[in-house]
């Protein structure tokens, strides 16, 4: 491989054959021009366009181009001026020099590793990468930047204590070479992500001697030779866990990315289990139920698996075999109509889990198909491969449909071709439907992020934001190239879509929730501006784990969402038509069953005008249902709580919930970040028997420990709730909960640009249980711009209903075009939102 390659790879890119003769001539002229006269405001557009074409050609021939190179095309589309032109001109020249090196066989050397794994998540290991000098020596002043991928949560890197964990060492076979450590402030995906959030990184500078051809350098991560315990592995599995490495050959400060060494990380010992089945089946129909053993971080477990009993409505219906397979697929059938609840337990009773509810119906009009329209792998700023992404969606998450929606600003032509081919290869008609698509990636002021899906898998190419950089140009070019019936565009709320414009032929849905948070305000913004859109949720997972995405950072901080599509059959056209018709609903990851109609018209549709509206809904939950809220034109029309206990005794169960608003304070801004709730709660005047966190899945930002009557905890909310269930005994008349919260600053990627992140002062409050009225009490804990952030205590029953139907008649102030939708919240903090039903009026055209 030209440039730098893995040691054992054969040549895949040739300077003689991967571009045409004419383009080669133009490239050589570009190299000479840059060498003779730096790029400037007057030349940047022409040079950037040729450079971008060069980069894509190199990528199509199999070359790795690094993370940032594809983005250079925007300089041709929107040529910068002033200071921006100076900065971006330097970037153009830097990449010209870099790709001149990549075209030179062996110029960037050869990278290898003797042991790629597999390594168990969270374990302490020593890993190494060895770089061998190629055709270009490393001059004095050159060196290596030992980068960290922002999403790879390895343990700490350090160079101060050889006997400590995470010690990074460098050694070379060149006896004359001397390295010194320096601190490099790194931004981008291999640093602090944003330039304003650059993070200190380790670099080694060659301060004496040169590295000549034939010599090598070895970087050891978690060096154990002087007593160190090693480097802690990340908490998530991957077939391509990155330890990015960059080289500076000449001391210029221009770091050249080397190929990612594909270290393999696998899940740990089985501590949990989950079952996946269809949501709707007919009586006697044979269906598949997948039983998946998982570790504490929701990875597929490794090692020895116990046998599991599968229970439906608390009766054992099947038992899996013990062994080393983490996933077992069973064939089952159910005779009786109605809802059925699935649970799983190991035969020794030490591991317990649940599955999704299954509704048995005769001749169902629609079935429910689950998917994830928004996920990433390592082809932009994420981790993993498209094959890992597709296998996880199909085998682990048991999705019906999925889209690998890579950011176009980091996506080169070679990676798009890999994604296109893999999407076609994994297509299994009638069983697993991957939709080809990408994420149009622009800041909110230019239109915000939008996922674009194609109905069919063909030779389509993205309408990239690098060439079509405002939302109106995306819509226009999609209409120019494709049939609007075969396109679905979905704006999302993190880097939010511009709700002032929405193309009704292309954009039937909006994404209301992802691992970034819950954003019901986003739905309200679109609907209140007259756009006829349904709702969907997705993961926005960046680790090749769509559909069953566990949180692991301070921004991708909650479980990934799911989109439910109502369709008659599991086929490409039926599911796509369901999205186009807005027959969808959104969940925060639990596979609840929702039904909703107004005067017999199903969700996502428009009913004939009537002054009397009979609104009916049904929820079949994965657990007890906490509340249902019905909205009319975004205002609460009706709400019901289902867990409240209004006859307290000496033993009580409480659900303590923290809640915060995620609505942008200023219109057009980014959503408010995560509010962190950290501190202690103490139960007074009663005995705390158990305290159970309801949604504490993030190993980075959440923690929980009970010590007698005191609980230490840390959690966070962003448009949702995070709850702790408390069981008390010997509750006295003066019983209370003392809540002491620490100072905390809001977090999250893409922070607001109008409003600064707020730091919320430490506070203490006393919650007297005698003040609970009708089973519920709310105390506001405001932040200046958000007066309704609160903590709510519910006195709750043990258990609760999982299947609830409701019917409401509305005759108040009817108007043409009124719309209705509902939200359901469970005791475990799971949420689902229906798509609206409109009454009368007419849709936007």
Predicted regions and their residues:
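C-terminal segment of classical bacterial N-terminal signal peptides
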Residues: 1-3
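Bacterial signal peptide processing site
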Residues: 5-7
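Ser/Thr/Pro/Gly-rich, low-complexity intrinsically disordered stalk/linker tracts of secreted
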Residues: 14-272
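Short, compositionally biased P/S/T/A/G/V-rich stretches that sit at domain boundaries
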Residues: 67, 71-118, 273-280, 575-609, ...
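Beta-strand/beta-sandwich contexts
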Residues: 134, 277-280, 297-298
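Extended, charged catalytic domains and RNA/DNA-binding interfaces, predominantly
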Residues: 282-845
């Amino acid at each position: 491989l030209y440039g730098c390659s893995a040691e054992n790879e054969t040549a895949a890119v040739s300077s003689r054959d991967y571009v045409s003769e004419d383009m080669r001539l133009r490239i050589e002229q570009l190299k000479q021009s840059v060498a003779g006269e730096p790029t400037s405001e007057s030349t940047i557009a022409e040079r950037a366009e040729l450079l971008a074409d060069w980069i894509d050609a190199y990528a199509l021939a199999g070359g790795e181009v690094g993370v940032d190179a594809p983005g250079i095309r925007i300089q041709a589309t929107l040529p910068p001026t002033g200071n921006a032109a100076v900065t971006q001109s330097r970037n153009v020249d830097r990449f010209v020099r870099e790709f001149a090196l990549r075209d030179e066989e062996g110029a960037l050397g050869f990278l290898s590793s003797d042991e790629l794994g597999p390594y168990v998540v969270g374990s302490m290991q020593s890993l190494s990468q060895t770089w061998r000098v190629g055709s270009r020596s490393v001059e004095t002043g050159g060196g290596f930047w030992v980068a960290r991928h922002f999403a790879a949560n390895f343990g700490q890197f350090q160079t101060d204590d050889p006997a400590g964990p995470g010690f990074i060492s460098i050694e070379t076979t060149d006896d004359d070479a001397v390295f010194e450590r320096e601190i490099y402030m790194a931004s981008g995906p291999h640093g602090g992500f944003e330039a304003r959030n650059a993070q200190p990184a380790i670099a080694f500078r060659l301060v004496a001697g040169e590295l000549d051809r034939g010599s090598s350098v070895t970087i050891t991560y978690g060096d154990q030779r002087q007593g160190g315990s090693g480097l802690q592995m990340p908490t998530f599995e991957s077939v391509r866990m990155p330890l990015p490495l960059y080289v500076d050959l000449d001391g210029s400060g221009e770091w050249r990315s080397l190929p990612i060494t594909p270290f393999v990380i696998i899940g740990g010992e089985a501590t949990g289990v989950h079952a996946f089945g269809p949501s709707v089946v007919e009586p006697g129909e044979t269906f598949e139920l997948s039983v998946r053993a998982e570790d504490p971080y929701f990875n597929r477990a490794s090692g020895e698996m116990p046998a599991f009993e599968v229970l439906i409505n608390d009766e054992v219906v099947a038992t899996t075999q013990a062994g080393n397979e983490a996933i077992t697929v069973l064939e089952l059938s159910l005779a009786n109509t109605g809802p059925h609840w699935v649970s799983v337990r190991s035969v020794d009773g030490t591991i317990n889990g649940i599955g999704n509810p299954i509704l048995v119906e005769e001749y169902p009009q629609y079935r429910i198909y689950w998917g994830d329209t928004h996920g990433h792998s390592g082809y932009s700023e994420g981790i993993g491969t498209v094959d890992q992404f597709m296998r996880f969606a199909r085998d682990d998450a048991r999705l019906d449909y999925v889209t690998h929606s890579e950011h176009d600003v980091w996506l080169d032509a070679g990676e798009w071709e890999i994604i296109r081919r893999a999407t076609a290869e994994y297509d299994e008609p009638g069983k697993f439907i991957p939709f080809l698509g990408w994420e149009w990636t622009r800041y909110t002021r230019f239109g915000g992020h939008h996922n674009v899906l194609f109905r069919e898998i063909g030779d389509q190419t993205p309408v990239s934001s690098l060439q079509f950089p405002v939302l109106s140009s995306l819509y226009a070019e999609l209409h120019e190239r494709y049939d609007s019936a075969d396109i679905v565009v979905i704006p999302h709320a993190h880097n939010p879509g511009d709700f002032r414009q929405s193309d009704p032929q292309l954009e039937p849905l909006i994404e209301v929730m992802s691992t970034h948070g819950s954003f019901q305000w986003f739905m309200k913004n679109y609907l209140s501006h007259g756009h006829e859109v349904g709702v969907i949720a997705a993961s926005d997972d960046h680790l090749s784990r769509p559909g069953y995405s566990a949180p692991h950072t301070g921004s991708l901080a909650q479980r990934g969402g799911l989109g439910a599509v109502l369709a008659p059959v599991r086929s490409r056209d039926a599911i796509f038509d369901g999205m186009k018709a807005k027959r969808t609903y959104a969940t925060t990851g639990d596979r609840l069953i929702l039904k909703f109609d107004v005067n017999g018209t199903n969700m996502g549709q428009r009913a004939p005008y009537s002054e009397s509206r009979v609104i009916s809904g049904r929820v079949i939950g994965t657990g007890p249902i906490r509340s249902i809220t019905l909205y009319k034109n975004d205002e609460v029309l009706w709400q019901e709580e289902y867990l409240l206990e209004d006859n307290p005794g000496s033993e009580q169960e409480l659900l303590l919930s923290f809640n915060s608003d995620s609505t942008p304070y200023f219109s057009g801004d980014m959503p408010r970040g995560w509010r962190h709730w950290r501190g202690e709660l103490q139960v007074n005047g009663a005995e705390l028997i158990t305290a159970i966190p309801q949604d504490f899945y993030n190993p980075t930002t959440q923690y929980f420990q009970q010590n007698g009557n005191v609980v230490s905890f840390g959690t966070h909310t962003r448009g949702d709730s995070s709850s702790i269930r408390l069981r008390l005994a010997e509750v006295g008349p003066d019983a209370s909960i003392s809540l002491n919260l620490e100072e905390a600053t809001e977090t999250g990627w893409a922070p607001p640009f109008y409003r600064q992140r707020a730091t919320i002062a430490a506070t203490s409050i006393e919650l007297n249980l005698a003040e609970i009225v009708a089973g519920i009490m709310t105390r506001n804990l405001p932040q200046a711009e958000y007066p309704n952030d609160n903590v709510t205590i519910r006195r709750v029953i043990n258990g609760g209903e999982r299947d609830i139907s409701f019917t409401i008649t509305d005759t108040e102030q009817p108007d043409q075009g009124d719309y209705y939708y509902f939200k359901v919240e469970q005791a475990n903090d799971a949420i689902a939102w229906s798509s609206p039903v409109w009454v009368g009026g007419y849709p936007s055209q």
